[in-house]
Amino acid sequence: TPHDFSLYKLGTLQRRIERRMAMAGIESGAGYLQVLREDSGERELLAKDLLINVTHFFRDTAAFDLLGEKIIPELVQRQTLDRPLRIWVPGCSTGEEAYSISMLFLEQIAAAKRNIKLQVFASDIDADCVAFARNGIYPESIEADVTPTRLARFFTKEDHSYQVVRELRE
């Protein structure tokens, strides 16, 4: 694959490889290596498994506090009204960080009473993750990471899940 996993921790690599071996029903490392040489599908599955998708809303509290208190207010104040404020979130995984950043920007734009159009672009090398993010449906467990005020403003409650409101998804 075109991905470089050389900086991953050995334990992480080993666990992910062992997981794929178990799923493929292969017991030996040599046997799995042979499968990887011959089966591009298995190579892609392993690469996808190695891509770490650890994410949740407002995951790094200190970083999001800094963004919300110092950086985003400054960007909002400096933004001219004749063009949109564009933000790119690379490596968005399933969207939680991208939506978290979007919420912070929309809150600051409202607090500053500025008529700024916000455009957030989120990308990831995993197309399935991007599709998940685009749908914006998350389990009830996000209540642990998202304040009730933000849940009410930025989400629609479904049966056992929350969906990000259209304003944020688009």
Protein language model annotation of sequence segments:
Residues 82-87, 98, 115:
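Active-site lining segments that contact anionic ligands and/or coordinate catalytic metals
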